[in-house]
Amino acid sequence: MQNIPPQVQAMLGQLESYQQQLQLVVQQKQKVQLELTEAKKALDEIESLPDDAVVYKTVGTLIVKTTKDKAVAELKEKIETLEVRLNALERQEKKLNEKLKELTAQIQSALRPPTAG
């Protein structure tokens, strides 16, 4: 790294930072996708039950009785919230990928030996 100009060293530091941010965003996105899949499966299952079915939900460490309508409404709200979060994470991931691509090109350009003209 001694022969690398300070400007390029700074860009490399920024590149590493973007890579770490991207890794976190991807992990969060995977977690949200998993939660969304589980919530949709639960909603499908509950909607297939008769209207007078007894439904339970977990609240912290407790399991409490609720109505089918309440459970459906809560799951739909949760799904909507997760979809909004997932869209935000996808936008963030796209922006970070664009920044990484741009910065990588800048670094490569800065490290390229000047051509004799």
Curated annotation (Swiss-Prot):
Keyword RNA-binding appears in the UniProt entry: no
A single GO BP: protein folding
GO cellular component: cytoplasm; prefoldin complex
Gene3D superfamilies the UniProt entry points to: 1.10.287.370
Keywords: Chaperone, Cytoplasm
Pfam families in UniProt: Prefoldin_2
Source organism, top-level taxon: Archaea
CDD domains per UniProt: Prefoldin_beta_GimC
Keyword Chaperone: yes
GO molecular function: protein folding chaperone; unfolded protein binding
Coiled-coil intervals: none
InterPro entries named in the record: PFD_beta-like, PfdB, Prefoldin
Listed NCBIfam families: gimC_beta
Subunit structure, as described in the record: Heterohexamer of two alpha and four beta subunits.
Family per record: Belongs to the prefoldin subunit beta family.
Function comment: Molecular chaperone capable of stabilizing a range of proteins. Seems to fulfill an ATP-independent, HSP70-like function in archaeal de novo protein folding.
HAMAP family named in the record: PfdB
PANTHER family: PREFOLDIN SUBUNIT 1 (PTHR20903:SF0), PREFOLDIN SUBUNIT 1-RELATED (PTHR20903)
Name listed for the protein in its UniProt record: Prefoldin subunit beta
Organism per entry: Thermococcus kodakarensis (strain ATCC BAA-918 / JCM 12380 / KOD1)
Gene name in the database record: pfdB
